[in-house]
Amino acid sequence: MGKKRIYELAKEINVASKDILETANKKGYDLKNHMATIDDNQEKTLRAAFQTKATPAASKPATPAAPKASEKSESGKIKINKTAIRRRPEADKKPAQHSNNRPQANANRNGQASNGQNRTNNARPNNNSARPNNSRPNTNSRPNNNSQNRSTSANHPMSLQEQISQANARRQRTQERIQQQREQREADEKKRREQANRPRPTRNNASNNRPSNGKPTNGARPTTNSPRPTVTKDGRPLGSSRPNNNNSARPNTTNNRPTNSRPATTPSRPVSAQEMQQKMQANTVSASKPASNNTASKPKNFGPDKKRGGGYNSYGNSQQRFNKKRKKTRKQQLAEQNAAKKEMPQRKERPLPEVLVFSEGMNVADIAKKIHREPAEIIKKLFMLGIMVNMNQSLDKDTIELLATDYGIEAEQKVEVDIADIDSVFETEAKSDANLVSRPPVVTIMGHVDHGKTTLLDNLRNSHVTDGEAGGITQHIGAYQTKLNDRLITFLDTPGHAAFTNMRARGADITDIIILVVAADDGVMPQTIEAINHAKAAKAPIIVAVNKIDKPGANPDHVMEQLMGYGLVPEDWGGDTIFVKISAKTGENIDDLLEMVLLEADVLELKANRDQKAVGTVIEARLDKGKGPVASLLVQQGTLRIGDPIVVGNTFGRVRVMTNDRGRRVKEVFPSEPVEITGLNDVPQAADRFVVFEDEKTARAAGEERAKRALLKERSRSNPVTLDNLFETMKQGELKEVGVIIKADVQGSTEALAGSLRKIEVEGVRVNIIHEAVGAINESDVTLAAASNAIIIGFNVRPTPQAKIQADAEQVDIRLHRIIYKAIEEIEAAMKGMLEPVYEEKVTGQLTVRETYNVSKIGTIAGCIVDTGVIRRDSGVRLIRDSIVIYEGKLSSLKRFKDDVKEVKTGFECGVTIEDYNDIKIDDQIEAYVMEEVPVK
C-alpha cells in the first residue's frame, strides 16, 4: 500500500489537518504541512489518537447518563433534542393516523424534542401566533412547541461550541414558553368553569376534522349561540385550545392529555422509536372510538357551511385530498424503508502495476487504463500537485513521472518505433541468417541498344520454357525464370537506351550476377560503359557475353581488348572475368553461358530464409484497367502469401492475386522468384522496397504515414524566394515554359521520359512536367491539360473515347509515341517554337546620291546610282554623311524613270524618296539592308 498524505487522512476521520499536524508533532513525527506523507504505522497511531478523543463526544446524544457538573440540569434536554433529530428516519417510519390527537411524531419530523411531556392536541397552548394560518394541513395533533425551531436546519454539521450555544438558547425559549403555557392554562381553566353551567350546542363533534381559518380545531367550541366565536389576539377562537372536561357528550380527552404542571428543569429520558409508536397507536385508538360514535349519530359536514360564512369549504376538501396523498406516500416510504436494500456492487480494486510504461503525449484516460484507476482520481491527484488538466489533455514526460512517483510506482518511457521506416525493417529482415536454404541466382542482362539482350532472353525462354506459355518479351524491365539441370535461374531484362539509366541501376542493385552483352561487330558503346559502372557500384560479378559471333565481320578479340581498358580481363588472358562467345540468334553456346551462371552462383553460396516475413523490391509497376494497380515484385527474403498485409513504397494493401512469370496464379512465392501482385491502393514507384506486416491496421498506418511524408517532401522542393536567389528567380520568371503531362504504360517508362525531357536544353525555354502517371489518358488528364495549357504525351498508351472527345472539344494536343526518340524530338521542337524569332541584319546594297530634286507635296527626291548589291522596295535604309549615320528609316518610293520598280541592281540609276525625311544632299551614301530570321540552334 502506498503512503498517504495528511489532508487525505484528515478527510477520512473528519478532523482538521492542523490538528493532525499538532498531534503528529507531539508524537515526534517530522511533518511540515498537509502535503506531507505518512506510512501505515503512523496512520494507525494517528487514527487511534483521534478515535480516543472522539468517542465521548459521539456517545453524548444517545447516553441518558447524568449531566456534568458544569452543565445545568437542562443538559438532558439538549441530548434529547439531538437524539430526536438523529432519529428522524425512525420517526418517519411510524404510521400516520388522521385523528384528533396525533402524538409527537410531527414534532420529531420537524427536528424538535418532545421535552418529555407527550402533549396532545387537546392540551394545545395558545402561543402559535408566529405560525402562518394557512401553512399546515388538516391535522389536529400538531404540537405547539415547534414554532420557534421550524426553520432550524439540523442537517448541517456544527462544532461542539455552536451546538452548546444553540442548546442554551433553545432551553431559554422552552422555559419562557412553558411559563406562558401555565398562565394560559390557568386562564382557560377559569373560563371552562364559567362555561360549564352553560348548555352545549347541538352540533357536538362533527367538525373535528374541518379546519377553521386555516388552523386545526381542537374539539372545544364556544358555548355561545353567536355565529362567530370571539377571537383572541393570535387569531384562535376563544376557549378552543382546551376541551370542556365536564361535557359528558365529548370523548374522554383527559385520557390523552398529560399534565403540564411538570417542572421544566426535570431531565427527561430519551424516547425510543418503539415507545413512540406504541403511544401513537394508543392515542389513535382512544380518539377513534368516540369519533365513530359521534359520526354515527350525525352525518359528516359536507357541502356549504352556513355558520362559516356560506359556500363550500374547498380548503378542507383540498386538505383531505392532500392528506390522502401524503398518507399514500408515507406508506410507500415505509415499504421502501422496510424493503431490503440491494447492496451496490463494489468496484474491484486492482493493484497498481510495478512499472508505468508511458509514451510522451499520453492523456489522463490512457494512464488511468494502465494503472487501473479512475480518471477523476488522477485528475484530483494532479490538482493537489498544482497541475490543472482535463481527461483528454496530453501530458508531458515530467508530469507523468511526477504522477507515477506520487503513486509510488516507477515510470519508464516506451521506446518509440517508427513503423513508417520500412527501410530499417528491410535491412533487418534481409540480414537474417536463421533457417537459411539455397535460392536461385538473380541474373541481370545489360548492354547497349541492339546488342541482342532481348534476343538472348527470348532464346532462353523458348529453349527452357514449355510451349504455349502465356506472355512474351516486353520492352520494359521484366523478370523471368528459366531452368537448367533442375535448377532455376531468375533473369532480369533491362532496356539499353540512355533514357533508362534508372532502370539499369535498379536492376544492378537487386541482382546477384550481371551478364554484359556486347556485340562482336559493334564493340564497346556508351551504354556498355554505363552498365560496367552500375555493376561495379553494386559489387556484382560480371559475365561478358560476346554476341553476334555468327555475323560476318565479327571480331570478339577486339571486344575483349576494349573491355580490358575498363578492368574486365578475360580468364584466358590471366584475369578473373568470364567471357563466353555466343550467338543469341542461333543459340550457339547458350548452355555454356547458363553453366557459367550456375558456377558463379555456387561460388557466391546464395541462401535465404523462407520462414520469415517477405521483403523485396519492386521491379516494375503499372495501372491495369481491369485489375487496378499492378506491381512486379522480386522476393528477396521470406515467403509472400496471398492475404499478406503489405507496404510497397508509399502504398499499402493486402495481396489479393499473385501471378508468376508464366501467367499462372500462385498462392505463395519464395525468395528470388518474380511475381505480379494486385491489391494495392496506388501504383508504387519502381525500385521501391516492400515489407510484409503482421496485420492490415499496422500496414495501413505505415503506408499512410509514408505517403504523408512523401507529400511533404514534394512540397518542400519548391525553393522560397530569398535575397540570395532573387536574381535567379527573376531570370526563371522570364523563361517560357512548355507544360507536359506524361502518361505511360509502366512506371519505369514514365521516369525515363520525364528525365529525358528535363535534360532538353533550349535557351529561354524549360520543360514543366505538370503530371506523370501510369495508365491510359483519361478525362481528368485532358481537364488538367486544358487548365494548364499543356501537351499530353502518351507513351505506349491510348486515350479513352471520352477523353478523345473532350480533347477535341477543348483543343488539347495529345501526342502518342512508341519510341522515346520521337517523343523527345517533338518536345524539343515545340520548345524551340515557343522562342521569339531572332533576326539578323543583312546589307543588300549601297547607293550614292548624284542629284536632288525638291517636289512639292512629295519632298526631296534623290537621284542615285547603285554602287554595289541590290536595293529593294521593302528595304530599310541608312543615310550616311561623312561616315556618320544621319538617319535610319524606310524607302518611301523606288523608281526607274517614271515607273515604280521592286528592285534595282548594281550599275543602274534610280530615284528614291525616304519616308518622312527630306534633308538629303549630293554625295550622301545610302545603305540598304533587310532583317533575316536566324534559325534556333
Swiss-Prot record:
- State where composition is biased (Polar residues): 97-116, 154-169, 202-229, 274-298
PANTHER family assigned: TR-TYPE G DOMAIN-CONTAINING PROTEIN, TRANSLATION INITIATION FACTOR IF-2-RELATED
> Where, in this chain's numbering, is GTP bound?
447-454, 493-497, 547-550
User: One GO MF term, please?
Assistant: GTPase activity
Q: Where is the tr-type G domain?
A: 438-607
Q: Where is this region: G2?
A: 472-476
Bias kind Low complexity: ranges: 52-68, 117-153, 240-269
Q: Which domain of life is it from?
A: Bacteria
What PROSITE patterns does the record tag this protein with? G_TR_2 (PS51722), IF2 (PS01176)
Q: Where is this region: G1?
A: 447-454
Q: Name one GO cellular component term.
A: cytosol
Subcellular localization, as worded in the UniProt entry:
Cytoplasm
> What is the role of the protein in this entry?
One of the essential components for the initiation of protein synthesis. Protects formylmethionyl-tRNA from spontaneous hydrolysis and promotes its binding to the 30S ribosomal subunits. Also involved in the hydrolysis of GTP during the formation of the 70S ribosomal complex.
Q: Which family does it belong to?
A: Belongs to the TRAFAC class translation factor GTPase superfamily. Classic translation factor GTPase family. IF-2 subfamily.
Q: Identify the keywords attached in UniProt to this record, alphabetized.
A: Cytoplasm, GTP-binding, Initiation factor, Nucleotide-binding, Protein biosynthesis
* Annotated spans, G5: 583-585
UniProt protein name = Translation initiation factor IF-2
Location of the region described as G3 in the Swiss-Prot/TrEMBL record: 493-496
Q: Where is this region: G4?
A: 547-550
For whether the record's keyword set contains Nucleotide-binding, the answer is: yes
* Chain intervals with Basic and acidic residues compositional bias: 173-197, 339-352
Region spans: Disordered: 47-352
Instruction: Name the principal localization, coarsely classed.
Output: cytoplasm
Does the keyword field hold Cytoplasm? yes
